[in-house]
Curated annotation (Swiss-Prot):
GO MF: 2,3-diketo-5-methylthiopentyl-1-phosphate enolase activity; 2-hydroxy-3-keto-5-methylthiopentenyl-1-phosphate phosphatase activity; acireductone synthase activity; magnesium ion binding
Top-rank taxon: Bacteria
Subunit structure: Monomer.
Cofactor(s) named in the record: Mg(2+)
Similarity section: Belongs to the HAD-like hydrolase superfamily. MasA/MtnC family.
Enzyme Commission designation: 3.1.3.77
UniProt remark on cofactor binding: Binds 1 Mg(2+) ion per subunit.
Pfam families: Hydrolase
Gene giving rise to this polypeptide: mtnC
Pathway assigned to this chain's UniProt record: Amino-acid biosynthesis; L-methionine biosynthesis via salvage pathway; L-methionine from S-methyl-5-thio-alpha-D-ribose 1-phosphate: step 3/6; Amino-acid biosynthesis; L-methionine biosynthesis via salvage pathway; L-methionine from S-methyl-5-thio-alpha-D-ribose 1-phosphate: step 4/6
Protein name (record): Enolase-phosphatase E1
């Protein structure tokens, strides 16, 4: 029996296109201006120092701009990049330049689960900070109260079984009582290996996999 739901964001409850076509280009467009303005701030210095450790060299502002810009183009799942993007997106969401779209069927179903007392968690490669911004400034307003918790790559890669085992521990349930929904077959495979129930969300632009149960809308879910 499913006692908790774990959800991916992009391609599952929000269009893939928003992140790729709106959020990523926004973070790249604002990158230089943001770093120039905030280069001396402790939280930004800390992010740059993490990158310097990865690169094994010190970075000038110009080099940091070039490197982050390249990583955005390559869609690299690197924690300091995600944290920096989180800061940039924060400005965008708070100014009203960015508003997070959600599939209506997903929003309605998450509300229904909340009313039934079924906890819903998010696991995304975007930082927890970015997730809070996303759900705090959605087209339906601030809906963070619909979720019981947020996980990002600090707990581990979404393609590793151990990440899902750790999440189950954090949630406080055995994996077989948690349902994970994602568009990504590799993530679903890792979650299944950890013992979770899994369903593939097949939205526009998503390639269906033959290995998993599928839905095209959250209205198909009966929990």
């Amino acid at each position: 029996m499913v006692k908790a739901i774990l959800l991916d964001i992009e391609g599952t409850i929000a269009p893939l296109s928003f992140v790729k076509e709106v959020m990523f280009p926004y973070s790249k467009k604002k990158l230089r201006e943001f770093l120039e303005k905030n280069w001396e701030k402790p939280e930004i210095k800390k992010i740059v120092q993490e990158v310097e450790k990865i690169e094994g060299r010190e970075l000038s502002l110009e080099e940091a701009v070039q490197l982050f810009s390249r990583w955005i183009d390559e869609d690299r799942k690197i924690t300091p990049l995600k944290e920096l993007q989180g800061h940039i997106w924060e400005e965008g969401f708070k100014s009203g330049e960015l508003k997070a779209p959600l599939y209506e069927d997903a929003y309605e179903k998450i509300k229904e689960w909340k009313e039934k007392g079924i906890p819903v968690y998010i696991y995304s490669s975007g930082s927890v900070k970015a997730q809070n911004l996303f759900f705090g400034h959605s087209v339906y307003g601030d809906i963070r109260n619909l979720f019981s918790g947020f996980f990002d790559t600090k707990i581990g890669s979404k393609r590793e079984r151990s990440s899902y085992e750790k999440i189950a521990k954090e949630i406080g349930l055995p994996p077989h009582e948690i349902l994970f929904i994602s568009d990504n077959p590799e993530e679903l495979k890792a979650a299944k290996e950890a013992g979770m129930k899994v369903i593939q969300s097949v939205r526009e632009g998503v390639e269906p996999s033959g290995d998993f149960e599928k839905i095209t809308s959250f209205r198909e879910l009966e929990i």
